[in-house]
Every structure is written in structure tokens, then in C-alpha cells.
């Protein structure tokens, strides 16, 4: 009986050890700025947050007036979408990499159907690149591999949001 109990305890410890990262570590990035560690991750947007922080399309339906203080990337996704699940950790890494330069947001198209309709989202994942002082650009889909997808995002962030040319 003692051997069985010991095996169960050791097995449980092994399983716990194989998954030692906490959910916080998996879903967020930590950036050190001015000696202070700050957690940077994509922000989940609701309709009201979008109206308050990005653009109030109810007040100004025919004119884009961006309310943000820096360029932004918005990921329109769904939990059941495989390409969206591939994209999610990539955007978390890029939120850390570009911290202080851009903001990364996520919109769940199932929960926020009005936002998806306003932007004509017909396929997911779709991405809205919002430069600080220019016209937003919409794109959709991902590349064939996660690495190529990350490179695609970097290129679009640099060119569209940060106005960098190679």
C-alpha cells in the first residue's frame, strides 16, 4: 500500500512538473521599462472599450477619428478557429517586442458581433492595423508556418504602423 501511495505521489509531482508555467506566464509578457517590470499582453476589447479607446463609430459613422495614443493592431478572432489559436501566442510575443511602440488588441467575433459587422469581418483571423495619423489597413489570414506568420506581422507592423521601410 505504501508503494502504491508513493507511486501516486511521484506521478502527480511529475505531471505537475511538466506543466510548471503558470497561466500568467503563458499568456503574458513581462517588459522591464525604467527599472519597473510591466506585464504586456493583448487587451480584449468589448464594444464599449472600442468606442471609448479606439473609435466612436456611433458618433462619427462616416469619418475615422482614432482616439488612441499610439498605433494599434486589432486581432479579430474566435476561440474555435485553428489559425486564430496559432496567431494568439505570436501576437503575445509581438506585444512584448513592440511594447511602448504599438498596442495589441483582440476582439472575439462571437462575443462582439456588432464590431465584427462594422468592419465587415467575413473570415478570421482578420487584423486591423491602425497607424497613429493615417488610414487603417485591414488584412486577413496567416502564413504557412508560425515563423512565417511572425515575420509577416513584423513586416506589416514596421511598414504600416511604424512607417519603417527596409
What are these model-derived regions, one by one?
Residues 45, 49, 72-75, 86, ...:
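Extracytoplasmic/secreted proteins, especially bacterial periplasmic and envelope-associated proteins
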Residues 69-72, 76-80, 123:
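Short pre-active-site segment immediately N-terminal to redox-active cysteine/selenocysteine motifs
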